[in-house]
Amino acid sequence: MKICQLTNTAEKQAVTRSILEALPEWFGIPEAREDYITESGDKQFFCAYDADKPVGFLYLKETGTATVELYVMGVLKEYHRQGIGRELFQRAKEAAGKAGYSFMQVKTVQMGKYEEYDRTNQFYLSLGFQEFEVFPTLWDEWNPCQVYVMAI
């Protein structure tokens, strides 16, 4: 497995599309998925490869002068629980620190709503994120937004 930082817009968008379309349990709303794909082009982007096959990615989005958000992350289901997400995160966290950011945040659906997102919440907690705030209607009433934060 190798982790690379991508800079080519078309390549970032192709990787984002291929992985998000394979994860409908998390990225099943077409409009939101297309927004993630479009936005990936100008973000700090990391990709995990198994040989030449992209199997996971994440990208960061600046939300303030001192804060960056782990904006979207996806790993193909057959590659879950192999440490790929953790490796992607470590590379991104290291890059964010070198870029001068002091904090990282991530948003997901609040624990206790959906099994898939409960696993996502547990993953973020295992990385060292801490609960910050829940916005009950930021996305909609069925998907309360949990914000996690960490110091870099």
Residue locations for each model-derived region?
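Conserved active-site alpha-helix within GNAT-family acetyltransferase domains
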Residues: 86, 111-134
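Conserved acetyl-CoA-binding loop-helix of GNAT-fold acetyltransferases
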Residues: 81-94, 122
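Conserved beta-strand in the GNAT
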Residues: 47, 53-61, 67-74
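Conserved GNAT acetyl-CoA-binding A-motif
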Residues: 96-115
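A short, internal acetyl-CoA/4′-phosphopantetheine-binding micro-motif in the GNAT/acyltransferase core
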Residues: 73-81, 110-112
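Short hydrophobic/aromatic beta-strand or adjacent loop that forms the aromatic wall/cage
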Residues: 43, 143-148
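Short amphipathic alpha-helix that is part of the acyltransferase structural core
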Residues: 1-31
